[in-house]
Amino acid sequence: MADKAEGGGLVFKPMEQFEITALFGGDVTWYTPTNTALWMGFSIIAVVLLLVVGSSKRAVVPSRAQSVAELAYGFIYKMVEDICGKEGLKFFPYIMTLFMFIVCANFLGLIPSSFTPTSHFAVTVVLALAVFVTVTILGFVKNGTAFLSLFWVSSAPLALRPVLAIIEIISYFVRPVSHSIRLAGNVMAGHAVIKVFAGFAALTLVSPVAILGITAMYGLEVLVSFIQAYVFTILTCVYLKDALHPHH
């Protein structure tokens, strides 16, 4: 939280919680088991447990796990159908998995002394690049060269179309960057603010205010954890729609 400096003051280290460390000591290399890998594993286990337990017993009066699983299933199914149409439902399993992984990783990251994989650009950029590569390949496979019409704004004045095409191409290739930074940045910011409040809790005079701040921020972070997973998923659906229907 906060360490004592040589002069007697407190030094806050809100970014220390995001450091990637080796689980068994030593330097971090390509194949070193790290805290990131551990908590991504926990997130996958949480998703599997929730969906398996939630779908194992389909009772008339659903259990909590069944209610959560059915709610998540219906929520994402409707999102995919509304944005991408019936044709996009074949990608529902992938989008559902993506949403559940992100939301579970975000929620597990709210546990004290845990680690949040989605606060790292290295993790979120892989998720975003997977979406980008998938929709780009799908766009060309389904539409051929007609997919390039996505970048040609036919409704604009003829003189502006080449300029707008360049802007559209740049914005298309920036998608994975903005897609990943939005998620990692928001998650990191919230956790850093909580850590700062936790540091101030060590000061007697302001500790009551700091504790109230931590409580309020935790409540906000629960909401942000869901919203960021929702935003990432809905943007994935929008990009998928562009690949399926580039003319719309």
UniProtKB/Swiss-Prot annotation:
Designated name of the protein: ATP synthase subunit a
Family: Belongs to the ATPase A chain family.
Membrane topology: Multi-pass membrane protein
Subcellular location field: Cell inner membrane
Gene Ontology CC, one term: plasma membrane
Annotated PROSITE patterns: ATPASE_A
GO MF entry, a single one: proton-transporting ATP synthase activity, rotational mechanism
Record's function text: Key component of the proton channel; it plays a direct role in the translocation of protons across the membrane.
Major location (coarse): membrane
Gene3D superfamilies in UniProt: ATP synthase, F0 complex, subunit A
UniProt keyword list: ATP synthesis, Cell inner membrane, Cell membrane, CF(0), Hydrogen ion transport, Ion transport, Membrane, Transmembrane, Transmembrane helix, Transport
Segments passing through the bilayer: 36-56, 91-111, 121-141, 147-167, 196-216, 220-240
Subunit and interaction comment: F-type ATPases have 2 components, CF(1) - the catalytic core - and CF(0) - the membrane proton channel. CF(1) has five subunits: alpha(3), beta(3), gamma(1), delta(1), epsilon(1). CF(0) has four main subunits: a, b, b' and c.
InterPro entries: ATP_synth_F0_asu, ATP_synth_F0_asu_AS, ATP_synth_F0_asu_bact/mt, F0_ATP_A_sf
Source organism (scientific name): Roseobacter denitrificans (strain ATCC 33942 / OCh 114)
